[in-house]
Amino acid sequence: MLCWGYWSLGQPGISTNLQGIVAEPQVCGFISDRSVKEVACGGNHSVFLLEDGEVYTCGLNTKGQLGHEREGNKPEQIGALADQHIIHVACGESHSLALSDRGQLFSWGAGSDGQLGLMTTEDSVAVPRLIQKLNQQTILQVSCGNWHCLALAADGQFFTWGKNSHGQLGLGKEFPSQASPQRVRSLEGIPLAQVAAGGAHSFALSLSGAVFGWGMNNAGQLGLSDEKDRESPCHVKLLRTQKVVYISCGEEHTAVLTKSGGVFTFGAGSCGQLGHDSMNDEVNPRRVLELMGSEVTQIACGRQHTLAFVPSSGLIYAFGCGARGQLGTGHTCNVKCPSPVKGYWAAHSGQLSARADRFKYHIVKQIFSGGDQTFVLCSKYENYSPAVDFRTMNQAHYTSLINDETIAVWRQKLSEHNNANTINGVVQILSSAACWNGSFLEKKIDEHFKTSPKIPGIDLNSTRVLFEKLMNSQHSMILEQILNSFESCLIPQLSSSPPDVEAMRIYLILPEFPLLQDSKYYITLTIPLAMAILRLDTNPSKVLDNWWSQVCPKYFMKLVNLYKGAVLYLLRGRKTFLIPVLFNNYITAALKLLEKLYKVNLKVKHVEYDTFYIPEISNLVDIQEDYLMWFLHQAGMKARPSIIQDTVTLCSYPFIFDAQAKTKMLQTDAELQMQVAVNGANLQNVFMLLTLEPLLARSPFLVLHVRRNNLVGDALRELSIHSDIDLKKPLKVIFDGEEAVDAGGVTKEFFLLLLKELLNPIYGMFTYYQDSNLLWFSDTCFVEHNWFHLIGITCGLAIYNSTVVDLHFPLALYKKLLNVKPGLEDLKELSPTEGRSLQELLDYPGEDVEETFCLNFTICRESYGVIEQKKLIPGGDNVTVCKDNRQEFVDAYVNYVFQISVHEWYTAFSSGFLKVCGGKVLELFQPSELRAMMVGNSNYNWEELEETAIYKGDYSATHPTVKLFWETFHEFPLEKKKKFLLFLTGSDRIPIYGMASLQIVIQSTASGEEYLPVAHTCYNLLDLPKYSSKEILSARLTQALDNYEGFSLA
């Protein structure tokens, strides 16, 4: 071992000048025959830790800091620690700490500021004492400032004690100096790799390189861009991306080492200790440029000097104060730039093998510095050992991790010593968010060093693998401890304001625990986790949203299904909850978490929107009652307790409802508004009777009088004379000259006939796209706006009166009605040829887009046989489409088709539609759901069609003709079956409630076999003659379908 610097007592074996200065490296002869593991330097004393765990001290002993009564002119063993195996030592100005292999911490020396942690402020303690308050902890790492101490426990808990004059304990403003270890809660949850103390400032380093500083900052030694002291840990943001792996502190300056071997310094620079070729202070971390060409693996700070070791050359560089020889350069001058320490240094033994003088060279193993002294552990050529690399973190020194190795150790311990101490040790780690947060880091290309509000830096796959292993029966004892730890400690103690993003990984880890999926643990694990997530403050909550945006769809799907399952579990067992408020709290937490996930999914589309549906809800909850409660709540009214017991309304979370449930809600809303309109009419009628004006009485229905031969004109006239409130009434249609009572069939016939008439191509209101069989608003139309308004009202009335109509509009229409902007996919649906062409333009890989496609910002449209060119942007005919603007061209093209060219007609249509159907309930629908509600869907179940059919006349399900009919029908191909639906019901799609809601009717007729089947479209009624054979039935039915062109009305 070599040493240099200031030796006030002039220890034997070291040659000093009269002032006790050693200006260049000398061999410490007094301890050369012992194997030194570690050296700690205080203000004027040193502590030597040997490989065998013995501790020696020398130097000034005025406060008992040597731990023995002997003079300090040579290293003497501390007898009081002889029975302990010490693995780590640290020194303050006049006090010392020693850490045993059992995680126990001993202190001695000056104690007037509480720096010994012994719950007293004795001026001095000459014999090492155990710090009792930490006895229940396994301490892994300690560091001393001048008058304060830091300690890191295995479970990630961080303790400080001693002087707090500048906030160096990190406990906040209200705390004075502390005579016993205090937990620093502001860093909880962060997996810490290192703690380091300077004169009166402190640092903590996370496993992923986040640096936190606090305490004295008079010279900028915290790196926080100012010179203000900090009473609580503050994130040094300028170092976040530097992959910091080690920190060393001087009295008023700080040095950090990065994974790439770079060195940053900041703080006091009055002696050149920052190495920036100046004597200036630095308030921001600044890289030491002189060392940039070298890969540094070790750094150490003394009071006012800094050391850096470069293994490739074997050289130690020193800079800063040299007045007491502490730089080892052979002189006592201050040095502003890194300078090599004097001596014979070699990188490794191979470098020396050919040299005759190889035996005088030193190969550095580790450097130590403190106060005005420096020590170097080194080896000679013949017993070379590789240098310690501070960039490689020693797992024994930082927050314990949960992995295969620790699980194996715990399993063995629990099987051998299943006692309280063993269990408590395991539970301490398992209950620590910090331990879990550091256990599954994404180490591929150092990804975890990039941890940020957008990147969690965690390998969820390894999390999943570990939990799956733990589900094995051989780990049952560990699993039991994990379960208990999660239930009683970890989840209940999760903070609403995590100190850093690294403390938030636990929210991604916990959902991977398989027992969360088990309904037995919904109340004790799954729901409490949801509550913890929902308690998060705004910023951490946004971070979790960002991370959920980054996870794989499989993980996201599992999370959604987890809380859907919890909602179902709670609804099914709601009667078992003796305290209703508990049920409300639990289900609200599950629903709000699903809502949070749903909002994330709206942005990133991990899963389809219907993944959030809980179809079973319709059977577990009265949708009408729930909607009524929601409606009253929205209106600021309260329902009578006798009507509604629970305060949670599922309608507040519409994303969990499938299309059928939403349709039920819309129909409930329609019935509610119809009732309001009817009641209003009835009230007015009573008033009119009382005032003898019965002729002015209002009908409780929306009654339309129309003629078949002037259907459009009459409909326009009738609807124009009714108020918006009238449109909310139940619809009844009367065809002039016909006495039929409208029980629903006449209304359906009215819709079918009116829409067929309005959509007739002769009016030119809509353009028919042959390759998609769809209609869209014509961009050149000469009919009045009120025609489009009428179509809108008609479509709204159809929905309002639960009637499916046969409309061939693309999904884009329903998107626009719900304020969703149509895109290229919608153009592909409407006009596949145009859509494919635009996609090819976007996908074209070459640079020659202009020459290949020859396009400008215009669109060609046919108007009454004439091709017209429309500009997509001002001056579009002079703007050529190129590689850089092609996306802009496609966006403008799509916008023209769906927005600009049809704005007038669509506005008239939507105002009519929304006049009837507008409102909050409509906003709950997805575009595809709104389309399915208006025109039905294609979820065919032909067996169900047969099972729900009704028979009249001579027919029954067992009648021979009926059997022949169904045999024939089920043999039809899909397109022919759809044609039958169109023939019988007026639409080839089925209502949103499914095939059962069609309930077709088949009745016998007296007609002979030569007659065709006849469909009464308005009533879903089929007149079926009694055919004698399957062949005749098939032929006649096929002929009827082939001859069908419009509505076959009775």
UniProtKB/Swiss-Prot annotation:
Main location: cytoplasm
GO molecular function: ubiquitin protein ligase activity
Residue ranges of every copy of the HECT domain listed in the record: 951-1050
GO terms classed as biological process: protein ubiquitination; ubiquitin-dependent protein catabolic process
Cross-referenced Pfam families: HECT, WD40_RLD
UniProt keyword annotations, A-Z: Cytoplasm, Cytoplasmic vesicle, Repeat, Transferase, Ubl conjugation, Ubl conjugation pathway
CDD domains xrefs: HECTc
Keyword hit for Magnesium: no
Catalytic activity of the protein: S-ubiquitinyl-[E2 ubiquitin-conjugating enzyme]-L-cysteine + [acceptor protein]-L-lysine = [E2 ubiquitin-conjugating enzyme]-L-cysteine + N(6)-ubiquitinyl-[acceptor protein]-L-lysine
Record's subcellular location: Cytoplasm; Cytoplasmic vesicle
Protein name in the entry: Probable E3 ubiquitin-protein ligase HERC3
One cellular component (GO) term of this entry: cytoplasmic vesicle
RCC1 repeat ranges, renumbered to this chain: 1-51, 52-101, 102-154, 156-207, 208-259, 261-311, 313-366
Organism, as annotated: Homo sapiens (Human)
Disulfide linkage: none
InterPro entries: HECT_dom, Hect_E3_ubiquitin_ligase, RCC1/BLIP-II, Reg_chr_condens, Ub-ligase/GTPase-reg
Enzyme Commission number: 2.3.2.26
Active-site residue list: C1018 (glycyl thioester intermediate)
Pathway(s) this gene product operates in, as recorded in its UniProt entry: Protein modification; protein ubiquitination
Broad EC category: transferase
PTM statement from Swiss-Prot or TrEMBL: Ubiquitinated; which promotes degradation by the proteasome.
UniProt function note: E3 ubiquitin-protein ligase which accepts ubiquitin from an E2 ubiquitin-conjugating enzyme in the form of a thioester and then directly transfers the ubiquitin to targeted substrates.
